Design a protein with these regions (language model features):
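Extracellular/virion structural assembly segments
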Residues: 1-11, 18, 66-72, 78-109
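Small/polar-rich, solvent-exposed N-terminal microdomains that initiate assembly or binding
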Residues: 1-67, 161-180
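Acidic-leaning, charged glycine-interspersed low-complexity segments
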Residues: 6, 17, 23, 95-152
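Short, solvent-exposed beta-alpha or beta-beta edge segments that form flexible loop/patches at the rim
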Residues: 28-92, 122-141, 155-159
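A hydrophobic membrane-anchoring alpha-helix module
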Residues: 146-165
């Protein structure tokens, strides 16, 4: 069985962070986190960094059992930038910067999307940028976006993956009941 091709979102967004001129100018540092709690822990590193791009190395998802079975995974990317506490103008400037970094990331994601579709990987075209409430972390503007990734999933039944199966065309006693 050949494994399904998968997209390495972590490596992709790390590369974007390292290559984007605005992200470099504003000193964004890339990091991997595990969930929102991991992002909160990463915010503690803002003592040594001015801004971060953090990707959640876990993903939410589901599998659809339809004519073209696929698996959907949702990857979350967080942004955070330090600013002076209680300075709403500075917070607004940070949000503007993060929105612009997001826009520039999306300009590269469009190109990546075309490449991925050639490998039967489909990105949801609706990617929302969400600002996190100003009281989430004092002195820090935060936002996130999520990318939904659909990949073809080979669900062909293979006898060699199972043991002690009945012959083809017969039912297992566990699945037969008298419905009279």
């Amino acid at each position: 069985m050949t494994p399904n091709f998968n997209w390495n979102a972590t490596a992709f967004f790390q590369q974007l962070t390292e290559q984007n001129k605005l992200a470099k100018e504003k000193r964004f540092r890339f990091c991997r986190v595990t969930g929102l709690q991991g992002f909160e822990e990463a915010l503690g590193s803002l003592q040594s960094a001015k801004a971060i791009v953090a990707i959640d190395d876990t993903s939410q998802g589901f599998m659809e059992l339809v004519n073209t079975p696929h698996t959907r995974r949702v990857k979350t990317v967080f942004f955070a930038m330090r600013h002076a506490i209680d300075d709403m103008a500075a917070r607004a400037r940070c949000m503007d910067t993060m929105r612009e970094v997001f826009r520039q990331f999306m300009s590269r994601l469009i190109l990546e999307r075309t490449r991925l579709e050639q490998k039967a990987i489909y990105l949801d075209e609706r990617i929302q940028f969400q600002e996190i409430d100003e009281y989430f972390f004092s002195g820090c503007a935060c936002a996130y976006f999520q990318v939904a990734v659909d990949t073809f999933t080979d669900l062909r039944f293979r006898y060699n993956e199972w043991e002690n199966l009945p012959e083809m065309g017969t039912f297992s006693p566990a699945f037969t009941q008298d419905y009279d």
